[in-house]
């Protein structure tokens, strides 16, 4: 398999990108890597060229660039060239730590949507602290600020496939992020989406979930509109990290006995911190496009890059994209019936 890598995307590119790719190359013997980037910057960083190819580019999409304009105008950028390699069949997957909006645009307009998917979505695996499984899928994280009920329904399908194929969860359960657990909670979009998902034969829907319950493990897939999902993700991550910081500060200020107790608890704190560390978790996936497209945090280091390569490898090995396409192709009538029922409900 071949992975097209945007070597210039990210706060620490190209150094940490190249370091991560070399770690992954040594870890996985069946992956070839295509590094797209500025030759004078990338070439000196590679210590071993085994299964690594450099494709020189002359432009870089910066973090502050307007996504669609950058994709269209910077045709020789590392990100666009890597996306085109996937589109043209020269690579099997696309990786970047760069501009999220530009990567979304490249994934949708260059790699292309899976036929039958209305809107691709951004998904990630978050830690589950009390559930049956260690992780759950959370989507959409901001690919679509506003979503229709039919989009949320499709996210349930896409998220279920990711949970089963990549996380190895059998018969994953699905919940809808809302401002209350009751069926009649939320705005009209979420009320209608709840009814559509409730009657869905495509996945195992358990109802609504509130943001405070996200990490409790009550669902294997949590579906949200992009605005709510992005806000909930950042609030959850920020709160968790701040709590760990405050606990550590309280221990340090509690005298000798407190510090001794803190030393005993150190392994537990490290375990929790590791679960929350994006460098360990891998990247966010753009689900609903014709090939694996994965984005790591902009400040990701080599460890995150290497771990994300393993994540992409699993997606390819488990035929995630082709299985989604096959499911949609063979359930066209079911999906269309759901949309028609939705339209009838809206117009009633």
Curated annotation (Swiss-Prot):
SUPFAM superfamilies: Isocitrate/Isopropylmalate dehydrogenase-like. It catalyses: a fatty acyl-[ACP] + phosphate = an acyl phosphate + holo-[ACP]. Keywords: Cytoplasm, Lipid biosynthesis, Lipid metabolism, Phospholipid biosynthesis, Phospholipid metabolism, Transferase. It comes from the Bacteria. GO terms for molecular function: phosphate:acyl-[acyl carrier protein] acyltransferase activity. Its EC number is 2.3.1.274. GO terms for cellular component: cytoplasm. GO terms for biological process: fatty acid biosynthetic process; phospholipid biosynthetic process. Pathway: Lipid metabolism; phospholipid metabolism. HAMAP family: PlsX. Homodimer. Probably interacts with PlsY. Catalyzes the reversible formation of acyl-phosphate (acyl-PO(4)) from acyl-[acyl-carrier-protein] (acyl-ACP). This enzyme utilizes acyl-ACP as fatty acyl donor, but not acyl-CoA. This is Phosphate acyltransferase. It comes from Leuconostoc citreum (strain KM20).
